[in-house]
């Protein structure tokens, strides 16, 4: 397990530790947490009699959803790896959920965006494992700052 704690939480439910609540999962990486989605509420016009672009911007910035890829390793014997892989899938397959950790203090609001499939079995020394790169969409369009408990700040 990593020295940091990684959490996920479905709306209206208690937070769960990603690495321990489903079985034996090891966090590998999470890509896309720093991505900011394209701004949606901007309108521009060009006119032939002007060198300047006319711009309208909404008061509050709204963004398009961004992609996040969460990569995890599932360890244990073959049956345990399969059960852990399925338990996590059953948790995230339907509905929206939050992800955050106590390393970056960034929180994302996510849905499962694409197929969820494991890698071929691999070995680290004598330890068998499978990995999965899980494609997610951040519905906020950017991550928000949070504390260790996941409360937005």
Go through each PLM region and give its residues.
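Extracellular/virion structural assembly segments
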Residues: 1-153
